[in-house]
């Protein structure tokens, strides 16, 4: 079982240049004060960027997160959050994605930028 299954990330849609994932905010993803853990938001953002990036590579390639940053703008104690990742740059060896995490009312909770490395699969 991967991290996405452990915390409950669900894929909504994936297409070249865009990916959308969701997560139900429950106690298992809270920080000590009862709010969505910032690290979980970063995991959600990188997961969305990674699955989106995977749609733009060749069958003999694989993607890895190279760098990520996140600005946490608002908190959330319960409910559904949605991460929408959109490609800013799709190159041969790197991709750059912007990810916005919103709640059910479209309130922006977190904005993130993720750089993805594209590598050849090892044989």
From Swiss-Prot:
Presence of keyword Hydrolase: yes
Catalysed transformations (reactions): 1,4-dihydroxy-2-naphthoyl-CoA + H2O = 1,4-dihydroxy-2-naphthoate + CoA + H(+)
Pfam family, one: 4HBT
Keywords from the named record: Hydrolase, Menaquinone biosynthesis, Virulence
Residues annotated as the enzyme's active site: 46 (nucleophile or proton acceptor)
Listed EC numbers: 3.1.2.28
GO MF annotations, alphabetized: 1,4-dihydroxy-2-naphthoyl-CoA thioesterase activity
Organism superkingdom: Bacteria
Pathway(s) the chain acts in: Quinol/quinone metabolism; menaquinone biosynthesis
Phenotype upon gene inactivation: Deletion of the gene results in an ablated membrane potential, indicative of a non-functional electron transport chain (ETC) and an inability to aerobically respire. Mutants fail to replicate in minimal defined medium and are killed in the cytosol approximately 4- to 6-fold more frequently than the wild-type strain.
GO cellular component: cytosol
GO BP terms: menaquinone biosynthetic process
NCBIfam families: MenI_Listeria (NF047425), unchar_dom_1 (TIGR00369)
Function (record text): Catalyzes the hydrolysis of 1,4-dihydroxy-2-naphthoyl-CoA (DHNA-CoA) to 1,4-dihydroxy-2-naphthoate (DHNA) and free coenzyme A. Production of DHNA is required for protection against bacteriolysis in the cytosol of macrophages and tissue-specific virulence in vivo, suggesting that MenI is required to protect the bacteria from killing in the macrophage cytosol.
Similarity field: Belongs to the thioesterase PaaI family.
Protein name from the UniProt record: 1,4-dihydroxy-2-naphthoyl-CoA hydrolase
Species the sequence originates in: Listeria monocytogenes serotype 1/2a (strain 10403S)
Gene it is expressed from: menI
